[in-house]
Each structure stands twice: as C-alpha cells, then as structure tokens.
C-alpha cells in the first residue's frame, strides 16, 4: 500500500525491523531477526501464495477453532476487503469448518485518514462475522436478492450515519460483500463437500454470491430506495418477536 513498495501482508516485517533496531534484539519477543515464516498465512504474489493457498490456510485454522467450540458457541472475526475474491476464501474456511453465519454486522474499524487507505476509496468498515455450527438467525436478515439486501443495508447505513459516520462507496461495497458472503454460506452449507478441489469450492462460492446479488445490483437497488440519511432508526419487532421469527440451523 505504501506506493507499491510494501505489500500489506509484509507491513509487520517493515515495522518490526525498526522496532527491533530501537529496542534491541535482547528485548523479550524481539529475539528473532524477522517476522517472516515459511508457514505464514498471507496472500503474496511475489512469494507465489495465491487465493487458493490463502483459502486452504484459513480453512485449516477455522477447522481447528471450530473443533474447540462448544455446540452453538460463536466463532467471531472481523473482515473487510475491496475485492470479492477475498470473501471467497473466508467463506470457504467457514464452510469447511462445518459452520454457518448467524450474523454479519457492519462495524467502523479504521480511520479514513490512515496512510495506507487515504484516497484509495477503501472501506473503513469491517464486517463482524458471527459463525456457529447450530443456532438461530433472524428471518429478516436472510435476504435472497439485491432489493432485500438494500432494504437491510439502508437501515444499517442509517445507523452508521446517526453515529456520526459518513458511509462511502467503499464502505457500502464492503458491507454488501459481507452480507452476500453470509448468505452464500447459508445457502451452500446443506450441500457443501469439503473434499472437492479448492478451485471448485471457490468457484461455487463465487456463483452463489453472484446469484444473490452483485455489487452493481446492490448499488442500483440502494439508489432506487429511500435516501440513507432520512431513514429512521427503530426496531420493527421487540426481542421476543425477533426470536419467534428466527430460523434455526
């Protein structure tokens, strides 16, 4: 991100060199000369670690984490990226771990003025993925198309606006990707086969996501709907009603 000189996955090594120089190699935790490791899990074109490598690594990590969970306990992580490809890897990891998403929640996570994203159109909003092997999901969040997703996102964007944030096109894109990935996972879980080749699994997720909505579809649906800034923030149902309308998985 730093004018193409440092890959984002290599940023910690860039910082570590200077930190070690300042603190000294005898400082606890700084004994090693480098943070790099042959088994590190990053996408890195230079090191020939592609999306399949990243997806397989995430799946291995999520499987271990899922095995340690109590039944119905959540595995929660934050995620955002400008490209759909990155969400394919996360979705594959969740599905290979035998989990589904009971929620995907937009959450401000970064300052818009951060050096590596300033002026790039990148999002400052993460999606909080809440994943379980069994549980319940609110029925109104189980969207099937761009129009339904736009209705859900309109409320979320209004909430972000009311909190003092001004959602950008990049934020809208990443929020949409998070929801579309969640629903692709929901739809694929009953027929998911972990034994399939990675390339086939990633393509199945891509098709499932595109079958729900593309980013262009969502943008168009949002433009046709009510302006984000004028949507009131209120719950249609109380907690008891929402639980009654929840869908078990």
Regions found by a protein language model. Give the residues of each.
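S-adenosyl-L-methionine-dependent nucleic acid methyltransferase catalytic domains
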Residues: 1-249
